[in-house]
């Protein structure tokens, strides 16, 4: 990574080539920043775009660091997500791993998973646990990871010191995240011995089914997702049959329509650019 927090945005020297990914280090502070073209994450093709973006950010109320990262190739299905819980003694006790299938395409939602299929990868779990235990971390953590198609390595992008907004993928696979926190810190109950690795099969999704299946290019992965739908192992946290409020029952439909509209337009634009580049 490179970071820019100096007076001259053009003075940034990058250890990697363009294109690059740029984003604020503090999403909380960035929430209050207001400037034309604001996005959650920026995908920048050249130095001119980087300078313009940094200048726009510096003109806003945002005073934190702005991170610039190497662009790792691969679509959303190359992303991985890992949720962990470390007990009050700093020992990792629970992990749940998944493969992202589709991410939000709205400017302020980029990077938020819309669909995750449960997976297991004990190598990644071991690497994350080694880091967490080395620093004495406690509580929930959420890792963003990407598989680099150039060498098959796993690139750890960041660790969020909390549950991720899509943590329902853990629940969908059969594990209650609240149980770990309650038993460890509130009820004082002993946790299961050793490390518990989630192994349930599920498809977490808040994306329209047609959009999700259309986005996935890999035939084997698409068949797997179709199979999970057929088995009824898909779970949408916005779909709550017991909800009595008409407004809340309608919201998932509105959300799905907005996602369908945004994703359809973004996917059409991307495929047009790919065709033009051939």
Which residues are covered by each model-predicted region?
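Peripheral (often C-terminal) accessory segments that flank ATP-dependent C-N-forming ligase machineries
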Residues: 182-278
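Glycine-rich phosphate/pyrophosphate-binding beta-alpha loops
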Residues: 29, 101-105, 109-113, 160-174
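Conserved metal-phosphate-binding beta-hairpin within the catalytic cores
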Residues: 133-168
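Flexible, glycine/charged-enriched surface loops at secondary-structure junctions
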Residues: 67, 138-142, 191-197
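Oxyanion-binding "anion nests"
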Residues: 106-110, 118-143
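Glycine-rich phosphate-binding loop of ATP-grasp-fold ATP-dependent ligases
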Residues: 19-53, 79-81, 103-116
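Acidic/histidine-enriched active-site and ligand-binding environments that engage anionic O-linkages
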Residues: 12-21, 92
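Phosphate-binding site of ATP-dependent enzymes
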Residues: 5-7, 44-106, 119-126, 147, ...
